[in-house]
From Swiss-Prot:
Residues 130-220 form the Ig-like C2-type domain. Dramatically stimulates primary monocytes, macrophages, and dendritic cells to produce the inflammatory cytokines interleukin 1-beta, IL-6, monocyte chemoattractant protein 1, and TNF-alpha. The induction of inflammatory cytokine production potentially promotes the cytokine-mediated angiogenic proliferation of KSHV-infected cells. Interacts with human CD200R1. GO terms for biological process: heterotypic cell-cell adhesion. Residues 249-271 are cytoplasmic. The lineage of its organism: Viruses, Duplodnaviria, Heunggongvirae, Peploviricota, Herviviricetes. Residues 1-24 form the signal peptide. N-glycosylated. Residues 26-129 form the Ig-like V-type domain. SUPFAM superfamilies: Immunoglobulin (SSF48726). Keywords: Disulfide bond, Glycoprotein, Host cell membrane, Host membrane, Host-virus interaction, Immunoglobulin domain, Membrane, Signal, Transmembrane, Transmembrane helix. This is OX-2 membrane glycoprotein homolog.
Length: 271
């Protein structure tokens, strides 16, 4: 009998070792959207509760817990932010809403069994934002400077396709307060070179996706536009002034031609 009782802890240990939590997938969720993290335990065991934690320094933080006794309990800082959907003791799904950069990271799904024993798995979340882009052209007498800008998360890659791919260009980037990366590449095209093509294409790549944005350096110089507008305004003012002088002169001539004679003004005069 004593040998039986001695072997019971070893049996329990072997039983726990056979348990496994499945999940651990890497999930992507759109910024300001939602994402679902899922885990399950096989085979089914005597689980009393399931706890979701977020890994961070100096230690993990509880997000939400489910048990038959208390149902779903979400920690204060995650209320209106996260929830356990389809609650169960052998599988669990944590949904996070209104995703921001701070939500990115890895989460622990912990199955708690009798005796305080635990089986866990890890699911990691990546917050993404599909790229957007546009082209800016700045022209001077010496050169046309064309800049292609792209904003996204993870950082997008910006390149110039042929024929501008051989032109001198530089790429820079920075991350804004929302965690989005703004990347841009500038190409300088000297004027007076007849071999320089007037049209090019900016390529923005982001994972397996790509965006093509056409660019052109045709048209008037950017710095000439204000001067041209000023000239047109001056001509318009001059024309208005001349029209006013002409109208006033015409009105005076008309009044002078219709002036009454002295005889018309004295009805009592006799011959």
């Amino acid at each position: 009998m004593s040998s039986l009782f001695i072997s019971l802890p070893w049996v329990a240990f072997i039983w726990l070792a056979l348990l496994g939590a499945v999940g651990g997938a890497r999930v992507q969720g759109p910024m300001r959207g939602s994402a679902a993290l899922t885990c399950a335990i096989t085979p089914r065991a005597d689980i009393v509760s399931v706890t979701w934690q977020k890994r961070q320094l100096p230690g993990p933080v509880n997000v939400a817990t489910y048990s038959h006794s208390y149902g779903v309990v979400v920690q204060t800082q995650y209320r209106h932010k996260a929830n356990i959907t389809c609650p169960g003791l052998w599988n669990s799904t944590l949904v996070i809403h209104n995703l921001a950069v701070d939500d990115e990271g890895c989460y622990l799904c912990i199955f708690n069994s009798f005796g305080g024993r635990q089986v866990s798995c890890t699911a990691c979340l990546e917050v993404t934002s599909p790229p957007t882009g546009h082209v800016q052209v700045n022209s001077t007498e010496d050169a046309d400077t064309v800049t292609c800008l792209a904003t996204g998360r993870p950082p997008p890659n910006v390149t110039w396709a042929a024929p501008w791919n051989n032109a001198s260009s530089t790429q820079e980037q920075f991350t804004d307060s929302d965690g989005l990366t703004v990347a841009w590449r500038t190409v300088r095209l000297p004027r007076g070179d007849n071999t320089t093509p007037s049209e090019g294409i900016c390529l923005i790549t982001w994972g397996n996706e790509s965006i093509s944005i056409p660019a052109s350096i045709q048209g008037p110089l950017a710095h000439d536009l204000p001067a041209a507008q000023g000239t047109l305004a001056g001509v318009a003012i001059t024309l208005v002034g001349l029209f006013g002088i002409f109208a006033l002169h015409h009105c005076r001539r008309k009044q002078g031609g219709a002036s009454p004679t002295s005889d018309d003004m004295d009805p009592l005069s006799t011959q």
